[in-house]
From Swiss-Prot:
Domain Fatty acid hydroxylase: 129-263
Enzyme class: oxidoreductase
Protein's membrane topology: Multi-pass membrane protein
GO MF terms held by the record: C-4 methylsterol oxidase activity; cholesterol 25-hydroxylase activity; iron ion binding; steroid hydroxylase activity
SS bond partners: none
Sequence motif Histidine box-3, location on chain: 238-244
Native species: Homo sapiens (Human)
Motif mapping: Histidine box-1: 142-146
Taxonomic lineage of the native organism: Eukaryota, Metazoa, Chordata, Craniata, Vertebrata
Annotated protein name in UniProt: Cholesterol 25-hydroxylase
Annotated function: Catalyzes the formation of 25-hydroxycholesterol from cholesterol, leading to repress cholesterol biosynthetic enzymes. Plays a key role in cell positioning and movement in lymphoid tissues: 25-hydroxycholesterol is an intermediate in biosynthesis of 7-alpha,25-dihydroxycholesterol (7-alpha,25-OHC), an oxysterol that acts as a ligand for the G protein-coupled receptor GPR183/EBI2, a chemotactic receptor for a number of lymphoid cells.
Amino acid sequence: MSCHNCSDPQVLCSSGQLFLQPLWDHLRSWEALLQSPFFPVIFSITTYVGFCLPFVVLDILCSWVPALRRYKIHPDFSPSAQQLLPCLGQTLYQHVMFVFPVTLLHWARSPALLPHEAPELLLLLHHILFCLLLFDMEFFVWHLLHHKVPWLYRTFHKVHHQNSSSFALATQYMSVWELFSLGFFDMMNVTLLGCHPLTTLTFHVVNIWLSVEDHSGYNFPWSTHRLVPFGWYGGVVHHDLHHSHFNCNFAPYFTHWDKILGTLRTASVPAR
């Protein structure tokens, strides 16, 4: 159909789809890898470790470049090798021993099918936002329950709070139950919304980045909570208060659920 015969919304949608089509065509050239049962684990580990590494490097550089400490929420804290290595080891162990068998079973039952067409850009952005909002609500409820019910906290969530001052590689330092719960929320949301595979990949990248940033311990001028207006997004300062006080800020990203239930706690952090 000629563009002269298209309505404005159709033209806009087509433009959005054309914008992402080259990227999707490139990814589809790796179709064998994307459809492999190994891909979810490889993708998850490499994305997570890749996002953590810059913060690990910054923590090391803080010893030689004291000016970097002005961006740290806890300027006198830097994780030691004895703290970093168990976190990394547990992430690798859990993905190999627990996540991979589940993805293998899912692959055997329903292999991934890759459509030829890319998603429309606006639809991709809408789906990512909705997935984040759904995940934020689901984890808020899960998190609140695992703090309010002592048995749930001791059995499943306490391990995540072993490090009172958080750092990037501590993001996934958690029990297998917590890891699977978060993974289940991720996959349920993209399935409920019928997300395109490219949208699903993008959402996972965004979700991993936001969770690592929340635990990084660094409050930069470009941190997400500084970019989102009106205090809608909590960010690293918001989550650090949770690790410090335990009884507040249960939502991972946004602040509305904590505001509604009266569990929001804020801190005045000077601009850097």
